[in-house]
Amino acid sequence: MALSGSTPAPCWEEDECLDYYGMLSLHRMFEVVGGQLTECELELLAFLLDEAPGAAGGLARARSGLELLLELERRGQCDESNLRLLGQLLRVLARHDLLPHLARKRRRPVSPERYSYGTSSSSKRTEGSCRRRRQSSSSANSQQGQWETGSPPTKRQRRSRGRPSGGARRRRRGAPAAPQQQSEPARPSSEGKVTCDIRLRVRAEYCEHGPALEQGVASRRPQALARQLDVFGQATAVLRSRDLGSVVCDIKFSELSYLDAFWGDYLSGALLQALRGVFLTEALREAVGREAVRLLVSVDEADYEAGRRRLLLMEEEGGRRPTEAS
């Protein structure tokens, strides 16, 4: 018998469910993507979509990227199960940095956790381990000599003052690689050093494409579909001709302090300011003329998190080794 005053079973709201699984709603994704589109990119998207066959028009009146994406949803061209058109439009704009947002996975905010590093802890560990290895190798050599001859250390020292015996000369001549193998661990090897790769993307582009598209895109074909294809091809050719190029490089880090400093400079904008003088040269400014040019710098957050975990694990393992050895 059910009680009349019993509380109903709790039901999850859509936002709570999405937050639990670390997902973004469709409209929240529209806010993230639309908020990063420039006015020039909005004009280009509205121009391309309004010229499509059967388009209702009116996208040019959109005042923001959010309004434009909401209008696409209202027309049935973009929904939760079909984001193909939005992905194609972002590729036309060369905004590949916005494509990961279409997966609707919420990105966790990352802040650099700085440590008060004096001398590098890994270098200290390397010196300490090398010192311990030299001591252990020297003691192992003396013990091995005692075991081979079966003599006490005092007798072994007296014999080494004079000329070595024939048996010792034969052993030394027959096994020349044994001391080299024992001394190899004493040298710090750089091949086994743990590193992580951080991918850096730098791109220079024009701030506005509208005037160039207005001058270079026109079609006189009577059919709507043919005119749309002609306009789209011309706009793509104009944008490709105005591509100023990009650079993608992988930076290796072996110290956690350097990685945190690099990420902190990226978040604060110091990295962008430092790269501006390297890429926006006088030759580039003379080539573009009076048009405004901007520099875009992107560092993958997933690379930073994975690299930080890797280096932090190396620091923890290196800290446990001296305690286990002692």
From Swiss-Prot:
Its main location: nucleus. Expressed in most tissues. High levels were found in liver, kidney, heart, ovary, spleen, testes, skeletal muscle and peripheral blood leukocytes. Expression was absent or low in colon and small intestine. One of its GO terms (molecular function) is signaling receptor complex adaptor activity. Residues 25-104 form the DED domain. It holds the Pfam family TRADD-like_N. The keyword Transcription regulation applies. PANTHER family: DEATH EFFECTOR DOMAIN-CONTAINING PROTEIN, DNA-BINDING DEATH EFFECTOR DOMAIN-CONTAINING PROTEIN 2. A motif (Bipartite nuclear localization signal) lies at residues 155-173. Residues 155-174 have a biased composition (Basic residues). The lineage of its organism: Eukaryota, Metazoa, Chordata, Craniata, Vertebrata. Interacts with CASP8, CASP10 and GTF3C3. Homodimerizes and heterodimerizes with DEDD. One of its GO terms (biological process) is positive regulation of extrinsic apoptotic signaling pathway. Keywords: Apoptosis, DNA-binding, Nucleus, Transcription, Transcription regulation. It comes from Homo sapiens (Human). This is DNA-binding death effector domain-containing protein 2. InterPro entries: DEATH-like_dom_sf, DED_dom, DEDD/DEDD2, TRADD-like_N.
